[in-house]
């Protein structure tokens, strides 16, 4: 007689399972990862911190070129499909190709000993999604146990998955050329069958970000904001969310001894307030030190899982070594961080919404207060810029415009996310701020001390009492003085020896904003927002 879970796997096409290890304990996972007979990327290595380290092979990051969504009645009118005009990662896949990939993965997982992890994506019971992850690799089960919300014994008894992830990382697709796909590897979603298939890539983040893409599909259609942001809450219950692309300071600035962390990367905002999607953190570890990021450093202990780090012969980790990848990572359960919201990672409505940008052009002010229209404009623009070296040794800024500060994970059109976010903000009486953690006319990056002073002024409300003036071209309201912030930096023009230099750079950057925003002007709502952007 097949067990309930065996029957459910058989319905998916996974048959003759030798053994099901369901929701293993951390102790069990440790024993599985340490088995001497394991080979290749299945093998775990114990480090002196107590955490296990694994390698993910040639894939040390996500593989967006291999991401597909089945084009059918459910998805065709909702998904933000890639097009010649606006490229994104949501490529259509036909039903026949999906069927053949599904058979590849279910065949790979049949006749095996499997790990089945049942978990929730979303800390709020009313909005969460029940997820089942099926894999033959112990550390992949460990990764999802760390990253998603772990159910209670009682919840497991009656667990019915809304969505299934079948991870067949050991199998590749021999027919990819005939099927018109990018490569033999695949990350495919079927929104009707509610299944994600993974093949050829071992990278753990495909499961995490795959489920984020799904939450980004389902929740906004129900009027719930879905956000690529960190979030924290003060002693008075005041919630702040921090949007920003990689490297702008999301994790650093939301980790604040005066406030409790709700989560560091993915959140929803429903009728109850802001809630974390995850039960863990997935932190970058390149050049990690206890001095610079004590919370993350101390979270790397037993039950944490390191990816693609260099482990020395004595078992210690060389965090400065990026020879495998710059994208070295660690996943750990959120309770490895001390100052968190417990027992459930959720809080009330956000009163402060902070957009972080690292402007390498040296144009934007360190902080400005946004109108509702500007909030939509800068959210849709999703701007940041990096400094990249050029041949002649000049470092020139490279702008990045990533819609909603997370274009890679958007399943619907960006204007949908802006509309839902602003509606939530209006209902909660929230205020948005644009905070530049990048550079100014001095050629130096704005100091973390000044940025923390700015964040404090936003969170304690003192920015509301400050006098403001308008910055030309961008028409942004900037404060003239804030407590514990160097007043000389608040107007970016004052950081240039020659103010005409700022003007030239500002015109250049404004032109880039205008050009980027053209893609949103195909509908009336987008056209109406142009006035909130820079004026040349």
Swiss-Prot record:
Recorded metabolic or biological pathway in which this protein acts: Carbohydrate biosynthesis; gluconeogenesis
Short name of any one Pfam family annotated for the protein: PEPCK_ATP
Enzyme class: lyase
Highest taxon above the source species: Bacteria
A Gene Ontology term for the protein's cellular component: cytosol
Family named by the database record: Belongs to the phosphoenolpyruvate carboxykinase (ATP) family.
Known role: Involved in the gluconeogenesis. Catalyzes the conversion of oxaloacetate (OAA) to phosphoenolpyruvate (PEP) through direct phosphoryl transfer between the nucleoside triphosphate and OAA.
Protein name: Phosphoenolpyruvate carboxykinase (ATP)
Source organism of this protein record: Actinobacillus pleuropneumoniae serotype 5b (strain L20)
Recorded name of the encoding gene: pckA
